[in-house]
Amino acid sequence: MNEQQRLASQQVNSSTKKEEKDYSKYFESVYQPPSLKDAKKRGKEEVKIERDFGLPEEFRNFGTGRKFYIRTYGCQMNEHDTEVMAGIFTALGYEPTFSTEDADVVLLNTCAIRENAENKVFGELGHLKSLKRRNSDLLIGVCGCMSQEESVVNKIMQKNQHVDMVFGTHNIHRLPYILKDAMFSKETVVEVWSKEGDVIENLPKVRRGDIKAWVNIMYGCDKFCTYCIVPYTRGKERSRRPEDIIQEIRHLAANGYKEITLLGQNVNAYGKDFEDIEYGLGDLMDELRKVDIARIRFTTSHPRDFDDHLIEVLGKGGNLVEHIHLPVQSGSTEMLKIMARKYSREHYLELVRKIKEAIPNAVLTTDIIVGFPNETDEQFEETMSLYREVGFDTAFTFIYSPREGTPAAKMKDNVPMEVKKERLQRLNALVNKLAIEKNDRYKGQIVEVLVDGESKNNPEVLAGYTRTNKLVNFVAPKSLIGQLVKIKVTDAKTWSLNGELVEEPIEVE
C-alpha cells in the first residue's frame, strides 16, 4: 500500500508583477537552510504560549467579496494547518471556493517528506502560471514544509516568479499580514522563520466535517532520523498544555463530534518538554477516557517513546481505540542504527509483545522504507521477516527518497534503483497477502462502524470505519451518516470490508 496524497480545497486574492532581483537578502534576515548542527542546539530559546489571537481592526472585512482556495499535500498535520488557515480566511471575510478559476487567492500547503510530493507542487505551480497570466490580481502562495527548505524557496524565486508569497510552518497566525503585504507589494513576500516556533492557542478553524476532528497536542520533532527533514521544517518538540487540549476536545464533544485524532510529529514525546509538571501522553489519554466522546486516536508514534504507562492506559479501553500506527521503517537493527531510529529490532518486537499483551485485539499498522543507502539483501529480508512476525494489518511502504540537508542525503549508495523497486514489489506483495488474510477474519463478525458518508465509488452505499480503522461499505439510510452503527461483515477485500446493517445507531455511554 503506497502513500495516498490527501487533497483539500478552500481559498483568496490580489498582487502585482515582480522584477528580477537578488533574493539572498531574504534568507540572511529570516531564513536559514536545514542544518543538523544548528538544529541540535535547541532549547536555548523559550517557547512562548500565545492565547490572544485576534484580528486587528484594520483587517475587519479585509476579504469581503473575495474567495480563497487551499490545496493540501501530505500528512494530517498539514490538513489541520489548512483548517486553521481556512478559519483565518473566513474570519477575514473571505469565502471558500473549490475551483482555482474562481479564487482570488490560491495557497499550496506543501509537504517535504518525499521528492514526489515536491514534484507535484512544482507541477501545480506551472499550471497556475497560465491562470496568473489571465488574472494578474490573483494571489498565489506556497506555505508548509517545503517553504522551510532554502533550496526549494530559491527554486520558487528563480523559476516561479508568479508566486506572490512564501511562508512556513511557524507563522500561520501571521497570514493576515502576509496577505496584506503580498497584495500591495511588487516583490514576492517571503516570511519563513528559522526560529523553532511557539504554541499559538485560540486560532480559528474551519473543520472539514462535523463527525471527526484533528486536535494538535504537540508540534515538532527532536529525533533527527538521518533520512527525515521534519525536525528542520517543523522545529523542536513543544507540547500544548493539557488543560487546553482537554477543553478543546470537550468543546468538540459538546458540538456532536464522535471521533478525535490527536496529532503530533511524535505524539509519544508529548509532555517531555514540560518543566513544571511530570505529564505524558499516557496521562493525557487517561484523562480523555473521561470525556464523553466515542473514540480517541493518536498519530504518529515513535517506538522509542512508547512507554509502559501509555500501554497500561490504552489497555483500559473505553473510548481509546485498539488501532496503533507504529512506524518501524526497517526490520534490521543495523539499518535502524544508520537511520538513527535509536531502537533495535529486538526492542521493537518486545514493544509489540507488550502492546498485544495489554490489548489482545490491537491492530498494528506501520511505515517501511526500502532501498535505504547500502541496504543489503539480508537486511531487507530482516524487514520481511519482522513484518510476518508482528503480523501487521497493513503498511505504508516507500522507496527511500533523499532529502537535501539530511545526513542520509550525503551517504553513498550502491543499491541500484531496479533492486529497490524489486524489493518494494516484494514487500507490497507481502503487505497485500497479510491484509486480505487479516480482513478475512472479520467475515461473519459484527463490528461497530462510525458512518462517514457516501462511498466514493457508489453514492447508494455508505462507508465508515471500525475502531481498528477498517473501511466498511454497506447499504443503509443516509440518515445514519455521523452515527455509530452495528454492521455484520459479509465480504472482505484487501483494503476494505463489505457488510449489512444489523442495528440502529448506538448510544455513546
Swiss-Prot record:
Q: Which GO terms describe its cellular component?
A: cytosol
**Which of this chain's residues are annotated to bind [4Fe-4S] cluster 2?**
C221, C225, C228
> Where is [4Fe-4S] cluster 1 annotated to bind?
C75, C111, C145
Chain ranges of the TRAM domain: 440-503
Name where it mostly resides. cytoplasm
HAMAP family listed in its UniProt record: tRNA_metthiotr_MiaB
Its name, as the record gives it, is tRNA-2-methylthio-N(6)-dimethylallyladenosine synthase
Source organism (scientific name): Bacillus anthracis
Q: What is the lineage of its organism?
A: Bacteria, Bacillati, Bacillota, Bacilli, Bacillales
Q: Which gene encodes it?
A: miaB
